[in-house]
Amino acid sequence: MRDSVIDIRGLDRVQRARVQAKEEAPKRWSVDDIVALFELPFSDLMHRAQSVHRENFDPNGVQVSTLLSIKTGGCSEDCGYCPQAARYHTDVEKQDLHAAGRGTRSRVLPRRMRQPFCMAAWQPKQRDLEPVLAMIREVKAMGLETCATLGMLKDGQAEQLKEAGLDYYNHNLDTAPEYYGEVITTRTYQDRLDTLDRVREQDINVCCGGIIGMGESRVQRAGLLAQLANMERPPESVPDQLLTQVEGTPMYGMDELDPFEFVRTIAAARITMPQSFVRLSVGRQSMHEGIQALCFLAGANSIFYGEKLLTTGNPEAEADRKLFDKLGIHPL
């Protein structure tokens, strides 16, 4: 009796990836494997990453996403990079959920349909979750893909998000397990993995990446990618942030990462997670457009669009349009 074969031609990209993941034994990446990628000559690494990218995506297409903070500041965690932590003296003004969430519709309406629209708030209490669910339903009704980043989830909350129509949940690992204690002490690495498990159990797409340039070593950058690539199902979207140093946070004043090391990280992410969107996230404002172009060549195919990401700056919309025109890139 012949095994049944699924015709994947009529499926969208995410559905195809799920079918192929079941039919093909995934490669498990060791940290040493990924370090070896980092150590390739730059042109060889770029060629390999671009080849993998072309096998899985339109090489000239970039997903354009929008991020809206619906609750800002006053967070009880101690993430060393984050100006929203209440314990740090930064210029971030606290804004409660209801005030920040007003005007969601006006922020969404100008956007092109099917663009992912991400709503960010840190750990809303259960009583605050209903307004978030209402925002998800509202954005979903406009035909956009919905994404939320709300921090740790408790039992039952992922199910509520799924029922509201959430497409993606963002929850980053930040860094490798070995370096995590240098970044945050109020939550464990396992806490983050448990939240991702809750999201996966509800069959919500996962957006998960990290922050590069927090003082971690190259081996630790490889360790983060190994964590992501070796998940039972790798994240559908992998945001790679370049540390934005904010005065008042413990990581302000750190040595800046060499830009080519960031490009290498993008290339290694593309090779190890060939079917994931690799997103240039926070930190793009400080990148020369030549470095951004190299990141796209290395396999980055998603950006956040708009002048502000949560509490940090982002390239102006017109600058992004001009860069896309120079590079022959079109929005997906």
UniProtKB/Swiss-Prot annotation:
The keyword Iron applies. It catalyses: (4R,5S)-dethiobiotin + (sulfur carrier)-SH + 2 reduced [2Fe-2S]-[ferredoxin] + 2 S-adenosyl-L-methionine = (sulfur carrier)-H + biotin + 2 5'-deoxyadenosine + 2 L-methionine + 2 oxidized [2Fe-2S]-[ferredoxin]. [2Fe-2S] cluster binds at C118, C147, C207, R279. Disulfide bonds: none annotated. Catalyzes the conversion of dethiobiotin (DTB) to biotin by the insertion of a sulfur atom into dethiobiotin via a radical-based mechanism. Homodimer. Belongs to the radical SAM superfamily. Biotin synthase family. NCBIfam families: bioB (TIGR00433). This is Biotin synthase. It comes from Methylobacillus sp. (strain KT1). The gene is bioB.
